[in-house]
Amino acid sequence: MSTIVITTHGTLGDNLPYIALGKALKTRGHEIRMVVNEAVYSYVLKAGLEAFTSAHSRIGPEEVRGNAQLWNQLPLLKAKSKDKTKSVIKKDDIIDGATPLLKVCHGADMLISDSEQDIFAAVIVDVYDISWVRSRVTPFSQGFSDTKIEYHPYYKSWLNTENSKRFILAASPHFCPLSPEYSHVHQTGFWFYEDSDWSGGEPSEEIREFVEQEPKPLVLSYSSQPLENPQEIVEVHVRAADKLGRRILIHQGWADFNQSHLPSDIDRDNVMFANGFIAHDWLFSRAAAVINHGGIGTIARSLRNGCPVLVEPFAFDQFFNALQVQKLKVGTAMDTEKLTADRVANFLDKKVLTPDYKKRAVEVGEKINAEQGLIAACDLIESWLSS
């Protein structure tokens, strides 16, 4: 048995694939220690893994909702005069970030880091005789070569993967193949998280009856994306669903979508709000389309179930993921600054809810389902442990 430390950063959606990896490695007899932000502690413990606090501030629903404007990068991307200010990482920042890892990695055999933690993981590798595996759960950066991105010089050495033979990309090549310069990266397929509460397979009777009616409902799921204007987003989508004669299930998520956001003139029998976790495989396999923010986990799960998507991106890798959806013709994407009920309804009608888009989503989903991302990752990791 080996002791493996996994360190991650980000919101819940960023952490769940790593929790899934930790569970898979534990079933193979390894001791797993996870260094995460405090907001995802409960998910780590629920998976039967050891949880340790990272140096990062808590990133939970309340924290991100309080700074929702920081999670909307579209205005900055559209600005004619880009902000050229570059962040500077100080020595103290690196020490602070690496200190929790130093304690947890003592006596461990391997450290697995997501890309946000690489700069701290590199410090650990210099201190301990420990195997290091780098990783990403989104193909952004490794999936293209024709887009120019400026990084602070300090980051460039950590972004470079050419000298890293132990780098795993937990995304499907059927969603985004690697560009040639990243051919050395091991692409395993997606790491799907399965919650123990999903083992029953079906949600409450109320949700089941709502979802299983015809025509199939739309699903609005922004997952851990916070919003400055959740009421406006809800109103646009319930009105769009009404125009299409569709019911809509809205997942509360970190935007805190709720009944108070509904306009008074909407038939509430055609709208349902869902709190907490729902078995996504059950839900998405019964949905007409999943409207989402472009998170890689939500898109992957939708396609796994042959469900086309409408992507409404706000920040980070979401724009790249939206582009891939359009390239694959498994759905489309919209400018989130131009969301209206008429436009959303039209995009859904013409570029999501058609037989061709459904057929393509099913085809891609079958390829994704044929992959065994977690098994492939565990096999790689164990081969590196023994080498």
Please place each PLM-identified region on the residue numbering.
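Nucleotide-activated sugar donor-binding and catalytic core shared by glycosyltransferases
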Residues: T3-R33, A39, Y43-E50, S157, ...
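Short internal beta-strands
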Residues: I32-N37, I248-G253
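Nucleotide-sugar-dependent glycosyltransferase catalytic domains
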Residues: E38-R246, S260, K359, E363
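Short glycine-enriched loops at secondary-structure junctions
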Residues: T138, W254-A255, A315-D317
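Short, catalytically relevant binding-site loops at active-site mouths
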Residues: Q225-L227, A255-F257, T298
